[in-house]
Each structure stands twice: as C-alpha cells, then as structure tokens.
A protein has these predicted regions:
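A charged helix-plus-loop insertion that forms the helical arch/lid used to bind
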Residues: 37-50
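Non-catalytic, regulatory and substrate/membrane-recognition segments associated with hydrolase enzymes
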Residues: 87
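Glycine-rich phosphate-binding loop of ATP-grasp-fold ATP-dependent ligases
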Residues: 34
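Short, flexible active-site-proximal loops enriched in glycine and acidic residues
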Residues: 19, 78-80, 113-117
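Phosphate-binding chemistry for phosphorylated carbohydrates and sugar-nucleotides
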Residues: 1-7, 31, 40-41, 53-55, ...
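Hydrophobic or amphipathic alpha-helical targeting/insertion segments
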Residues: 19-30
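Glycine-rich phosphate/diphosphate-binding loops that line cofactor/substrate pockets in enzymes
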Residues: 9-17, 60-84, 153-166
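Short, flexible, solvent-exposed loop/turn segments with mixed acidic/basic and small polar residues
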Residues: 25-26, 77, 275-277
Length: 345
C-alpha cells in the first residue's frame, strides 16, 4: 500500500492531475484486501502504469529507489511537478490501517492528499473526475454525488410508464459492505414514494459471505439474509459497490438473473431503435468477453444485426477496448445526442 502511494504521486506528477487510490478487495472475502488506482477522468489506471505498479510492488526493498527512478524516466515524469492524491476505503477491518500506509507513501514523495475515508469505489471515481474537470462534471463531495445521481434518477423516472407499489419497491443485498452505509445516506435524496429495503447491511454477518453480487452470479441463486416474494425486484452490490446485479423469482419459485448480457442487449436494442427513429446511420456495437452467454451473442448478431466484439475476460479489457476517455463515454455521448434529437413522447 505504501508503494501504491508512491506510484500515485508519480502518476499525478506525470498527468498533472489528481489521482485516486481506493483501498478495497471488491468481491473477495473480508480478510482479503487490495488497492485500485483511478486515473484523471475517473477511469481505470492505464495499462502501461499497471505494469509499473507490478514492477514496483515486486521490487526488493534495496531496489525500491532505483525502481522509482526507472518509472520516472520511462514515463517522463517531472519530479518538480506538484502532486495530489485522493484516497477512499471500504469497510474491511484492515482498510483504515492500509489507507494510512497509502498516505505515508504519498507524503514521503511530497504529494498532497485528501482522505475521503469510507467511500464506495464509484464515489472515488466520481471525486477524481470532478476535481480534474473543474467542477464541470459535478461537485467533488458526497452531497454532490448524491445530488447528481438522484436528480438524474428523478428526471428519468418521470418518463417511466409504470404504476403500482410493486414498481416502486427494490430490495437491495448490500453484501455487508460499504454499499449499505452509502445507500442509507442516499435514500434521503430519493423520492419518498420509492421504497428501498436494505438487507445484509453490515449489522451482522461477514462481508461477501453467502451474499453479494459475485455470490449471486456464481451460484445462480438469491443471497442469504433476504426474503424474496414472486416477481419482487431485487439486486446485489459487491463489497465496494462498484458491481451490481439484478434478479427476481417467478410465481413458480424459479430464480432469474438479469445479467450484463441481458442488460447490454436491452440497451443496444433501445439505442438502435432511437437511431432508426431519427434516421441516423450510427452503428451501435456490443463488447463481450469469452464468458458471455452464447445465446445473447447470437441474438445480437443474427436478430438485432448488432456487431459484437470479443475481448479478454476482466472489466479492464472491456474498458480499454473503448476508444474514449472513460467508461461509459461512448454510451453517454450517444445518449446525449439522442436526447437532443428526440423529444420523449
């Protein structure tokens, strides 16, 4: 962790931007821990700097200074440039001490820092992006984060054609992690008519133990600690709340997972319909990994006529195949364009 603090300072100096460090092991067991570095626009760390991170982490103690010099020279880092690093952590017992080690690494190289304390990983990504865009993306505070998301949700909800209490209730498995703390806070920003019920909220039970998004995805069944009735809307976070998965049980008790393949298919179909409506010839494509459901691939290619591209397994490969600055920018750019062209009916 100390060394990742050092690396974050070098990356900040090289990019002349704020860099984020998140202490978390995501969907892994509570006793594990790890670190994620966040690049200037809230995106994942550049692949070349992942290599630097690996080299630095594995360097012998007596070779540490030489490793830092080598990275600085290879990446053309101006060591006289100011550096600023923002830090967040999840709720694991070890996270606070480890984040202190990150801070030690930042300060030993003369970097400045802001410790946000307990955050979800998406919240830290947001903070980094806000700080590096002069506030254009939003206010780099927890309140700013909640306000931005809740405002967008309220506006989107106005266009939804749903009715009845069943459509206003969501049960959330928080994996006994940071997602519970932050969702409790965010509930105050959401409409009163929306019922968000929290389960596995950290008051008892261990992080990611028989619960959480990875458990649900891997075992294809509901998490422990949540009671599901037929057709109730349910979802699960992972340990640092940067992963979410939706599911429900039908009237016969069969479990149904609304996974990424299904969501990607729905979104691409929706965007394609909008493009056809305004007569645009833009092409919408979908990127999948080798673990993708083969039926979804065939449906997209053969029925929807949407091109599908395959990349290596892992979110970083899905991220870096996109020729835009940060995750979701391709989608958001298209959506913004469509919103300007189409008035919702």
């Amino acid at each position: 962790m100390f060394r990742m603090g050092l690396l974050a300072v070098l990356r900040s100096k090289q990019t002349k931007s704020t860099i984020g460090v998140m202490v978390t092991a995501s969907h892994n067991p509570e006793d594990d821990n790890g670190v994620k570095l966040v690049d200037p626009l809230g995106e994942m760390l550049a692949p070349s700097w992942e290599e630097h991170a690996t080299h630095l982490a594995n360097a012998e103690e007596q070779d540490l200074a030489r490793a830092l010099v080598a990275i600085s020279e290879e990446a053309a880092v101006n060591l006289h440039q100011d550096a600023f690093v923002v830090i967040g952590r999840d709720t694991r017992p070890s996270s606070e001490k480890l984040s202190e080690s990150v801070i030690d690494g930042v300060t030993v190289l003369g970097g400045q820092f802001h410790d946000y304390g307990l955050l979800t990983t998406p919240q830290l990504h947001y903070m980094v992006c806000c700080r590096n865009t002069g506030g254009q993306y939003g206010e780099a505070t927890i309140d700013g984060y909640y306000h931005k998301l809740s405002t967008a949700f309220v506006e989107l909800s106005k266009q939804a054609s749903c009715s009845g209490d069943d459509y206003r209730t969501l049960k959330v498995d928080c994996a006994n992690g940071i997602g519970a703390l932050k969702l409790k806070e965010m509930k105050h920003y959401l409409p009163q008519g929306l019922s968000v019920q929290l389960f596995n909220d950290g008051t008892k039970g261990k992080l990611n133990h028989f619960c959480g998004a990875d458990f649900v995805k891997s075992h294809q069944k509901p998490p422990e600690g949540i009671e599901m009735k037929a057709n109730e809307r349910c979802c699960s976070f992972d340990g640092d709340a940067d992963r979410i998965i939706y599911y429900y049980c039908d009237v016969d008790g069969h479990f149904h997972l609304i996974d990424g393949d299904k969501i990607a298919t729905l979104i691409s179909s929706f965007l394609k319909e909008l493009l056809l409506e305004i007569g645009e010839s833009l092409t919408v494509g979908v990127v999948q990994t080798a673990y993708a459901n083969g039926s979804s691939t065939r449906y997209l290619e053969e029925v929807m006529k949407v091109p599908v591209y395959c990349t290596k397994t892992g979110v970083k490969h899905l991220h870096h195949i996109e020729p835009f600055p940060f995750p979701g920018s391709l989608l958001s750019s298209i959506v913004r364009y469509l919103c300007e062209e189409i008035t919702p009916s």
